[in-house]
Amino acid sequence: MPSDKAAYLAAHYLSTDPPNKSSSSTSKKRKRKNKSAEDGLIIADDDDTSWAQAAKRDSDDDDFDGPVLAAGVVSADFRKAKKSGWKTVGSSSAFAKQATTSTTTNSTKEDIDAAAAADAILAQTAAETAALAREAGGDDEVLVVDTTTGATALTRSHQPAETATQAPIMSNGTHAGLQSASAITAQLKARQEAERLELERIRAERDQQHPEDQEELVLRDATGRRIDASMRRAEARRQQAEAERKEAEKKRALKGEVQLEQARRRREELEEAKLMPLARSKDDEQLNAELKQQDRWNDPMAQFLAPEEVKVKGRKKGTAGRRPTYKGPAPPNRYGIKPGYRWDGVDRSNGFEAERFKALNRRERNKGLEYAWQMDE
């Protein structure tokens, strides 16, 4: 009986493929296999032009043509460890335990081999992606899919650190993306400075290669006629000198004749001083002449000198500072003022001065007559 029971258990429960397995267990196992396959590495053929592949491409919302890497995938996910579903029944526990141990050992070896193969595939895929990125110059973007969270992100594929940190530069010299106003201003200034330096370098190289073809400054007037720069500068200097001369004449006109004469004499004295000897004695004729020409208010000999002998720089003392007077006869007036030298001899007064003098003369005459009459009596 025990042998029959052990044979029955081995035939019905210890077989890996039982003959009378229900459809429900088969469907469950198929679902688990499909799930493990979905969680593992997916290798898709980009060159597949079938209708199924086209439908998958059309259903994708993100129009991304780059390579796709799965993040968060380990080799153990490709082949999950299978637990033994065997049960020990009755007295055949030792046999069942031995069978379970052998099955678990076989499944563990298979899992290790599958994990090693998956790791090799992942390493080969990463190496191929890095090689493609290096050949493309490090500018290709790779879509990384995290299988644990389902998130996707675009990353640079194995490019140098200095190029990975730099954002794309637009045509105006600024970086693409959201930036502050100060950053954009600094980028524009840097672009302008770089363009200015480049232009100066190009001009310097051109001048060194062709020094005879240097640019000449051309000036034109409002009508478009060409103006010579040297003639324009000479005209500007002439106009400036003319303006200074007019300003000096205007200041000179504000001064009187006496001040101008004194200034002229002072200039002449300075010019003559260049030729004078350093020591001047009492016998110096020029010094004595200058001292004689000076007028002093307390000079005791001034009253004995004739007016013709007293001269001030070639002009007589009697005529110095006097205005010309009328030389002909003129009617008298009570103040003794003589008419000007331009008077034409016509008396245009109201006759008061003449009547006054007549009254004075009449009074004096009457006074003399009265005195004479008294003597006669």
Swiss-Prot record:
Residues 1-47, 203-255, 293-341 are annotated as: Disordered. It comes from the Eukaryota. It is found in: Cytoplasm; Nucleus. GO terms for biological process: mRNA splicing, via spliceosome. GO terms for cellular component: cytoplasm; U2-type spliceosomal complex. Keywords: Coiled coil, Cytoplasm, mRNA processing, mRNA splicing, Nucleus, Spliceosome. Residues 185-276 form a coiled coil. Pfam families: Bud13 (PF09736). Involved in pre-mRNA splicing. Belongs to the CWC26 family. Associated with the spliceosome. This is Pre-mRNA-splicing factor cwc-26. The gene is cwc-26.
